[in-house]
A protein has these predicted regions:
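A sequence/structural signal for flexible, mid-protein segments enriched
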Residues: 22-398
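C-terminal motif of bacterial Sec signal peptides marking the signal peptidase cleavage site
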Residues: 17-20
Length: 398
């Protein structure tokens, strides 16, 4: 049988839509049936008492060295329904392929499923599931490595019930992605010459204070099944290196916790193990844990995804750079004269991609406009690497 390679672009985490991950893999022979067409990927849990976000993605088959088109979800509809037939209709969000369903009014006593209708593909449904109640997040802590090379973030929770606790976590991040240096001047080129001009104070502020946003891209799960107590203590979420700009000023993590049953936990456990062990989200898995979504229109069609039904516990934590005292700054300015031995040094620096920061100062404090400090652009303009605006919840004065 012809070997078919797939490039998978899927959203790795649900509830809050996560950043995409791409994996290359070779399916086993049983997975090749019908794989010439892209597979539907449905990602998102039903959040009882909150907003449900569902990402519609697809695999992209690569046949004969040519990557085939994925599935178009134009005109798709998403809804949640209970066993009595009541429907909560979703709406497309601003992000392509993402639909949002208002499930704040759902009762914890009901059983619910997710339904998706895709033009030219048919209807897809997850299995009805009861609502799992997530306990509160007890604490989000962090611990610095002994060599100060990184900081590790951890989450703790517990359940007073006797049944084992199965949890999954996702998180979003916001941080001040400020520039390490502030430029007071900039270089301009005109008629074969490089000259300097002052940067207005307002523009200096815009270039020196920025904000960025990120989403978790891993699978974070925990269980008390094999523990003597129903306590998940300091389960590691992720690690940030000491040179990462996320911890250069003020960092915030918004953590979402959902509870799940053993079946859902097993799905994510094997998926996580498969990714780390073979490099592919769709490495061979036992058929009984492929997911809980089926095609109503074509029952034999393979669908990727697992829809859990749970309440959501959230916690937000702020970490200031001075609390960690570990961010390693890499930016410095180097002093260069305008001319040296008849050569225009600034001309060469300008066309090398470097930028000026400020003039050297004379003994009396006045600027020496024949000498200036230069550095790389990303050291003085945080807009180069920022991707967001100031969050509404950000502390005043920041």
């Amino acid at each position: 049988m012809k070997r078919i390679f797939l490039k998978i672009a899927v959203y790795c985490l649900s509830a809050v839509v996560m950043g995409s991950c791409v994996y290359d893999f070779v399916p086993d022979s049983s997975d090749l049936q019908g794989i010439e067409k892209p597979l539907v990927v449905i990602e998102g849990d039903i959040i009882v008492g909150g907003m449900t976000s569902v990402a519609l993605k697809s695999t992209s088959p690569v046949l004969g060295g040519i990557e085939q088109d994925g599935i178009s979800y134009a005109g798709a509809s998403v809804w949640v329904e209970n066993e009595e037939g009541a429907i909560w209709q979703g709406e497309p969000s601003q992000e392509s392929g993402v639909h949002v369903v208002d499930t704040r009014g759902l009762s914890q006593e009901g059983r619910y499923r997710l339904c998706v209708s895709v033009p030219d593909r048919g209807e897809y449904r997850s299995a009805f599931k009861q609502v799992m109640v997530s306990p509160p997040i007890d604490n989000v802590s962090y611990e610095k490595a002994d060599d100060n090379s990184c900081v590790q973030f951890e989450v703790s929770t517990h359940n007073s019930a006797s049944a084992p606790l199965y949890c999954r976590w996702t998180f979003t991040e916001d941080w001040e992605s400020n520039s390490e240096l502030t430029a007071e001047i900039r270089a301009k080129y005109k008629e074969g010459k490089v000259y300097m001009e002052d940067i207005p104070e307002e523009e200096r502020e815009e270039a020196s204070r920025c904000y960025s946003h990120g989403n978790s891209t891993g699978i974070y799960i925990g269980s008390t099944e094999k523990l003597s107590q129903n306590v998940i203590d300091r389960e590691r979420l992720h690690t940030i290196n000491a040179t990462d700009k996320r911890i250069s000023s003020l960092y915030c993590m918004n953590i979402s916790q959902t509870a799940m049953d053993k079946e859902a936990y097993k799905y994510w456990e094997v998926t996580k193990s498969s990714i780390s062990g073979t490099g592919g989200l769709f490495a061979p898995m036992p058929s009984e844990i492929r997911g809980n979504i089926t095609s109503v229109t074509f029952p034999d069609e393979k669908v990727i995804g697992y829809v859990n039904v749970s309440t959501e516990s959230v916690k937000r934590v702020f970490v200031y750079a001075h609390e960690l005292n570990m961010f390693k700054r890499n930016c410095n300015g180097v002093l260069y004269p305008e001319e040296e031995e008849g050569d225009n040094v600034w001309f060469s620096l300008y066309f090398s991609g470097l930028v000026p920061i400020r003039y050297e100062l004379k003994e009396n404090g006045d600027p020496d406009k024949s000498q200036a400090y230069w550095t790389s652009p990303d050291c003085v303009d945080c807009r180069i690497f920022s991707n967001s605006s100031r969050p509404a919840y950000w502390p005043e004065g920041r």
